Amino acid sequence: MSAFNEVKKNFGFGLMRLPMKDGKIDNVELCKMVDFFMERGFNYFDTAHGYHNGLSEVAVRECLSSRYPRESYVLTNKLSSSYFKTQEDIRPYFELQLKECGVEYFDFYLMHAQDKRLFEKYKKHNAYE
């Protein structure tokens, strides 16, 4: 079954701009937001390593993946060109993202900020393989 079929409502929770407290992500508030979202039948979440300097992924782990069964939500992450220089850098980066998010897989994995120049970089380093 496609992950598209698992998205319950056509609205997603982007984890790019999160509640802050004392210069850090306010996980207490974020957990409340995640709970509110899930309780209303929404289940699609979107993050990227660059959001909050990698801490958005940690927030996913602390407020979503450690608190809800994996099959209850759909999670998207992204490959950002600034985090790899060679093809060999891509897999360790991907595995770090899985670990930081506390999951074994992503439902969707996007090439972040596509443009012609970055498309060529992704192709050159076999990111589409």
Show which residues each predicted segment covers.
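Structural motif corresponding to the early beta-alpha repeats
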Residues: 51, 67-87, 112-115
